[in-house]
Amino acid sequence: MWSLGIETVFVTARPPRWIDPLAEHVGGHGVVICANGAFVYEVAARRVVEAVGLARPSLTAIVADVREAYPGVGFAAERPEGMHLDPGYRSPMLPPHAHDDPSIERGPIESVRGVVGKLLARDPATPDVAFVEGVAAIVAERGIVAYSGAGGLAEIGPPGVTKATALARWCLERGIDAADVWAFGDMPNDEPMLAWAGRSFAMDSGHEEVKALADEVCAGNDDDGVAQVLERIR
């Protein structure tokens, strides 16, 4: 794509700490939009260059309200400096021995330091959809609750911050119109971005809501669906 003068940018729910393996694929501009739009990560320098976080009073209130509704909930936070783990947070997606990893800050979620771009909440006792919908109702206008396919995980970001808003800002800085953007997605957290882009593609392996929204459904991830679409413009 670079040789054709087409910019490509990764926009992901993943935190910066999961991005480094993608370094060779990121492209000349060298950045990835992470954490559902909360962070812009410069891969070569291994640093977050832009960060938007939850206001501390909102974070504290959200934690208290969600905990009251779901007593078994555990929390974690994604920050520019890395992850913060509350003692009660359990997830099959945590790396092995995460609770013993010295690079991860640990303690009650109320003690988290720095910018919290994404607050993670998980209650193993509550069905996935019911939990995410319940948390969204509790959070209301204080933040945006996203679901990226991780079992039972509610991802709470700052109000007004989505993949779409971050990508729109990135494009504006480069003089790229929404009409000229092709976006690919597979999960509900992609929906605002797909609605914003001039042309949207849902992966066939993706969520049914996303496939209903997109302009076109392409082959799934295992069948190189993105590559198949991009071959059209060579």
Locate each region found by the language model:
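Short, structured coil segments at secondary-structure junctions
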Residues: 26-28, 35-36, 44, 139-142, ...
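Active-site phosphate-binding/coordination module
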Residues: 2-92
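Hydrophobic packing residues within well-ordered alpha-helices of enzyme cores
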Residues: 19-23, 131, 135, 194, ...
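Conserved acidic, metal-coordinating active-site core of Asp-based
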Residues: 69-184, 188-196
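Short, charged, surface-exposed secondary-structure boundary motifs
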Residues: 42-44, 211-217, 227-231
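Acidic, Mg2+-coordinating phosphoryl-transfer loop and its flanking beta/alpha structural elements
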Residues: 12, 167, 177-214, 219-221
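Residue-level signal for inorganic ion chemistry
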Residues: 1, 12, 36, 119, ...
